[in-house]
Amino acid sequence: MAKAIQIEKFSYSYPDGTKALSDITLDIDHGRRIALIGPNGAGKSTLLLAMAGFIRGTGTIIIDGLKLTNGNLKQVRSRIGCCLENPEDQLFMPTLFDDVAFGPLNMGLDAEQVRQRVSAALDKVGLSGMAQRAPHHLSAGQKRAASIATVLSMSPKIITLDEPDGSLDPRRRDNLASLLTGLSQTLVIATCSMDFAAAIADTAVIIDGGRVVTAGPADEIMSDLKLMSNHGLEVPKKFINGQA
């Protein structure tokens, strides 16, 4: 069975020549919940963009067995959905229904299929009954859930999320963690919140200076005080308090 994501010796430089990612090699199995952790500017968000083909570098990226090329971006993006750092970037239609239906409509699904996809996605994220709400009237937590619904309606096998817990209060952050752990898709989550990462991930990948430092079981990596501090990261509270 193909891996969910395979990356081999991938590198990327910004237009000004600054190196953003260097020789990234990473294998991700289906069904995993991956936390990409590292200091600000480490390359986490850039790597998420590369996975979906929004930026192109050197090396190889394979998504669910499909090698990413300029000619198959549409196929690749049917397998991997992206939740951007600012959920409002994915909420641009008059109603929530329209936003969640946007992807399925562009896939060419008929009206009934679209309606079913929208209903299922909104139900999954806890926004049933809000289909006709204007997105700008939603709370921060609801906007984040809505942005996830716009991806779920496309039925991808893999979902990437860039700082999904940003701007959320503790209760909404806990609600989001519960939502994400209830999804069956492979999740790749870039976050600076170690407590949030520890609540969700079964696997952690530390990225620093555009390179993968280590990857492995989340509990082992995130409870390693020396390793975490060497890369400017805090050990999650659950390990400090002996809850793990």
Where are these regions (language model features)?
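The feature captures the beta-strand-to-loop junction immediately N-terminal to the Walker
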Residues: 37-39
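Helix-to-loop junction immediately C-terminal to a conserved catalytic motif
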Residues: 52
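Conserved ABC transporter NBD signature motif
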Residues: 59-68, 76
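Conserved ABC ATPase "signature" region
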Residues: 112-130
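Conserved ABC ATPase signature
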Residues: 134-138, 142
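H-loop/switch region of ABC-family ATPase nucleotide-binding domains
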Residues: 191-192
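Conserved beta-strand-loop-alpha-helix hinge in the C-terminal portion
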Residues: 211-234
